[in-house]
Each structure stands twice: as C-alpha cells, then as structure tokens.
Curated annotation (Swiss-Prot):
In plants, chitin acts as a microbe-associated molecular pattern (MAMP) that is recognized by lysin motif (LysM)-containing plant cell surface-localized pattern recognition receptors (PRRs) that activate a plethora of downstream immune responses. This is Secreted LysM effector LysM6. Belongs to the secreted LysM effector family. One of its GO terms (molecular function) is chitin binding. The gene is LysM6.
Length: 543
C-alpha cells in the first residue's frame, strides 16, 4: 500500500472516530436529561409525561429531550394521529402500568364518592377488565357494579392489600389492628363472630339477612351524620324481655353532653327501670349499627390546659386521642350511638375485665372520649371565678365549642387532620392541616408556598395550616405555610377522614394521577413509597 493510500485510510479512520465521539456526546446528555428532569414524578416504571391538549409526537419527544425515533421505540403502541389528553407516554424504556411493589403487593387505590371502574380505568389508563382481573382475590370485592366507598382495589398485578380498617368493627379483617394472615385464603376467618352469628360487611356480628347474606350490599355512600340520640336507659323502659333496644336518631344538630363521672353513672344505672329489662336481654345479638357504651370508669384521661403560645409542645395532645386514635372511615365522628341496656347493666355490675379484653372496646371508648371532651379546656379559669359562676338552668343548652386548646395546640375534635412529616416514621418537623368539611366537594383546593391561602387560625369555617419546627432553642415553634411546606413528605398521619392528593397544583383529580389517603388503623403513620405522587395540591374531608 502506497503512502497516498495509507493517508486516505488514516483519514477515514479519523473521521469514523470523530463521528463516534459526536454520537456519544449527543446520546449521553439525552440520557442524563431523562434521569435528571424533575418532570418525572409520576409513579410509573418508565420516566413518563402526560399528553397535553394539542400535543403531537414531535412535541412529546421534544419535551422528553429525546429524538422522534427514540420516542417511537419507547411507545410502540401509541398512535400519533390520536393522542388523548392525559395519556401517559414513556420517555425511556419500561411501561406505564404500575408494577407490584417490592413486597409483591398490588398498587392499592381507595374508592372515593362518585367513583366507577370506567372513571378509574380512564384516569389510570387501564381497562375495566384489568380491574376485574386484578381484584378476584381482593377482600370485600363485589365487582365493578358495587364499589364500596372507602374500600381498596388493586390497579396492578400483585397480592391485594389488607382492607381499610373500620372504626368500631368487631369481626372480619377490618377490625382495627388486624394483622395480615400468612395465607390470604384465611382472611375470611379473621376475628370470627360467636357461634350462630354472621359478620356483616360493616364488621358487626348478628343474625338475619343483613349479616348472613353472602351477596354484595348496594353501592354504599357514608351514612348521613346523626348527632342526636335517645338514651338507651329511657328506651329500655319499652323494650321487651327478648328485644334489644333500638337507637333512634335525627339529623338535627344538638349539643353533646360531657361524660358523666363514673360513680354517678353507676348509681344512676342501678336505680333506673332499665336494669331489670336489661338483665333479661343479656346475650341478644347487637344490631349492625350498635356500639357498646362504656362508662368513664374504664379509662381515665386527664387533660390540662396551658397557655396558647407558639412555643408550646404540640405533641402532648392534638387531634389524636392519647394511646389510641379512632377516626372513622364510614361513620361520622359526631354520631352518638346508644348501647343496648344489657351493656349498661354489665357496666353497672362492675365487670371491668370485659372492657380490657378486646382492643375494639378500647377504640370505641377513645372515640367517645374524643366526642365528649368538654370545651372548658380552652382556657384556664381561676377556682374563685368558677365558684362564683351561676349553674346553668335545666332548660338551658350549651353549645359545644368547635375548637379546643390543649397544651397550646388548637384542635377541631370533630374534623379531619393531616400531619405531613419531613422524616421517615412520622418524625421531625411537620405541617399540620385541620378542617371540618364533611364532603369532598366542600373542600377548597389546598396548596402551599406562595400560592397558599391557608390561615393559621383554627376555626369551624375554614382549613388551618401550621408548620411546626424545632429551632436551635429546642422549643417547638409554628409559622404559616406560605413560605415553607412539604410537597414530598416522607411520612404522614391522616386522622378522621380522607385526603385526595394530586401532583399538579390545580387539584385536577381526573386528568392527572391522584391518590387518596385515609386512616389505616392503630399506628397511623404512613411512609412514602415510590408510587406516591408529589403533594402538589390536595382536597380533604371527613368522609
């Protein structure tokens, strides 16, 4: 080979080397951009974006910072001629469907008011057939035609999660604190009822069609709040020997009386006519909506009021009852449930051991204590002033304060609350959101940082937000949520309601991927998982 041919050969090799270097220099930034862009916050297996109004495949490829050919290879089934708004598309290898998590469990979705399988499938870009297939083993799954509000369904392959706990449930897998069985086929046998009774879909034992009917209930919405109930003692006068006293409720609001001291309650029960009737009803099954009423003798909770300073310790008492928190998924917290007279007679005889056996009764007691905490803890009144104050007349009614101040923290006992922590395991600084609205449509779109309109004052007419931190001084302090907040909390506690979170800032719960969080039972703390979205905006309600 002559020198001229060698020169040509070396020149060609140099050009190939330069071309390869250019290709590498172009390809590497493309991959880095895909990994580094903050846009990819949606819980998919591939880095993805959502199709916007009027987007073309070229527009989407440009937003992904990749070539049109790469976009086509990552989305082989996407038709560029018809791109529906809100459809997720991949900017890298993978697929947009949710995979099972690291434990093999499915991606769980909490049913909200107004949900249908068609709406859920459209929002998560799956099919109704997928939902039916993935939920064949889900507890309390009755098909797409009978979705149960507050229940959970699988939106991916994997083992179903435990059903959401129901406050006051006494049987079945939805009793608060029930652990997952080793064999999923054993879930129906958890917390069985006594012999001869069946467990209803609401977790109550009894007999008859409402308890022993294996068919699914009608699509259920949460019951309407009932804040006025007749006393079981007075109702027992008309009860027969083999009947359980019924509970009559009205929708008219009424003040809830504070709990009666234990000694007084026992003496009153023993002198009423209900005692003899109650003893005859012993052993009768409870109705589906009954709760065992326990007197204040079972547990004593001492609440001390303190000054309302910003440095007060917020952990001493908040919206959660000490020891156990009992927000309800299906039952409103202000519902007053009268017990069968048999339960009161049992309390009067002093059988305290029965109160300590099942955890469900402790939960019920905590719920009633929360509803009956008196508003007098909002301020410290001198003993001399209390002695001079007039006793209220028998016909007068005292309106219960919607807010309480305990150890410097103002709370709304009958409302919902959400604590979002910056540490795993619900530790560290946190944002405390509190409200009172009962329905999702009554909630305003809540946002943080400069767009926030949330106030720090806790009232019964608006949502409040406080950002609690511990500065170098070592004392807890709070400030507003306008400048500092958490849009990706590492853990959170949802009490007495549900919050629907959306990664956008417009509370767009249809076109974007949203998730609903509710009370999960004792322990309460929920740590962030890879499938949890950014907390861009949210709506919360008692539910």
């Amino acid at each position: 080979m002559g020198s001229f041919q060698k020169g040509i050969f070396l020149a060609l090799c140099g050009l190939r080397l330069i071309q390869g270097t250019v290709v590498l220099s172009v390809a590497e930034p493309e991959n880095n951009q895909i990994k580094d862009r903050a846009l990819y916050t949606y819980p998919y297996t591939c880095p993805s974006i959502l199709v916007g109004t009027g987007d073309t495949c070229d527009d989407l490829a440009s937003r992904c910072s990749i070539s049109a050919a790469s976009f086509t290879s990552f989305n082989p089934t996407t038709g560029c001629s018809s791109l529906p708004r809100g459809k997720p598309v991949c900017c890298g290898p993978g697929e947009t469907r949710f995979p099972p998590d690291s434990g093999g469990y499915c991606y769980a979705y909490t049913i909200r008011d107004g949900d249908t399988c068609a709406k859920i499938a459209e929002g998560y870009k799956i099919t109704t057939a997928d939902i039916e297939t993935w939920n064949t083993n889900t507890s309390a799954w009755y098909g797409c035609n009978k979705l149960q509000q507050g229940g959970q369904v699988c939106l991916s392959k994997g083992e179903p999660s435990m059903p959401v706990a129901i406050g006051g449930a006494v049987c079945g897998p939805q009793v608060p604190g029930t652990a997952r069985p080793i064999l999923w086929t054993s879930i129906a046998s958890l917390n069985p009822c006594p012999a001869g009774q069946c467990c209803s879909t609401k977790g109550q034992c009894g007999t008859g069609k409402d308890f022993c009917d294996s068919s699914a209930p009608a699509a259920a919405a949460p019951p309407a709040p009932a804040t006025k109930a007749k006393s079981a003692v007075s109702e027992a006068k008309a009860a027969t020997a083999n009947e359980v006293t019924s509970v009559k409720t009205t929708s008219a609001p009424a003040a809830i009386a504070p709990p009666v001291p234990a000694t007084k309650a026992i003496s009153t029960s023993s002198t009423t006519k209900a005692t003899s009737a109650a003893s005859e009803t012993k052993g009768a099954p409870l109705s589906a909506r009954s709760f065992v009423t326990m007197t204040a003798a079972a547990v004593t909770v001492t609440v001390k009021a303190a000054s309302t300073t910003k440095n007060a310790d917020p952990h001493a008492f908040t919206t959660d009852i000490p020891l156990v928190d009992v927000p309800l998924t299906f039952l409103h917290p202000e519902d007053t449930k009268s017990a069968p007279a048999a339960a009161q007679t049992k309390a009067a005889t002093g059988d305290v051991a029965d109160f300590l056996k099942p955890a469900k009764e402790i939960s019920i007691l905590a719920s009633q204590l929360r509803n009956n905490l008196v508003s007098t803890t909002t301020s410290v009144t001198k003993a001399t002033g209390a002695a001079k104050s007039k006793a209220p007349s028998e016909n007068s009614q005292t309106k219960k304060s919607p807010t309480q101040t305990v150890n410097g923290v103002v709370t709304v006992p009958s409302g919902w609350s959400l604590k979002m922590f910056d540490g795993i395991g619900c530790t560290g600084s946190y944002v405390l959101l509190q409200g009172h609205n009962k329905k999702l449509e009554d909630s305003t779109c809540m946002k943080f940082r400069s767009a926030s309109t949330l106030q720090t004052d806790v009232t019964d007419t608006a949502v409040s937000c406080r950002w609690w931190t511990i500065p170098e001084s070592g004392n807890w302090e709070w400030r507003d949520c306008h400048s500092n907040s958490l849009n990706r909390p590492k853990s959170w506690i949802m009490s007495n309601g549900l919050c629907t979170v959306s990664p956008n800032t417009k509370c767009d719960l249809v076109s974007d991927i949203s998730q609903t969080y509710g009370w999960r039972g004792p322990g309460l703390c929920q740590d962030r998982k890879t499938v949890d979205p950014t907390f861009g905006s949210l709506k919360c309600y008692v539910g």
